[in-house]
Amino acid sequence: MIIWTWRWKDDKGVRFVERFYDDGSKYVTEYHPDFIWDYRITKDGKRLAEIHTPNYDHLDN
């Protein structure tokens, strides 16, 4: 279960959404200009289940 969510933006303009869970893990989504990167970090600090998807918002379809 999600305990809380933190949203922030770094100095380069990359937006982050971090979802913290009651088991000590967190799920992070990074919104870069041309791709989105999702991954889970366990309570031990291991990075799991990385997903890299292109960002199609900037394309004219």
Model-derived regions: residue spans:
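Acidic, low-complexity, intrinsically disordered interaction modules
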Residues: 6-60
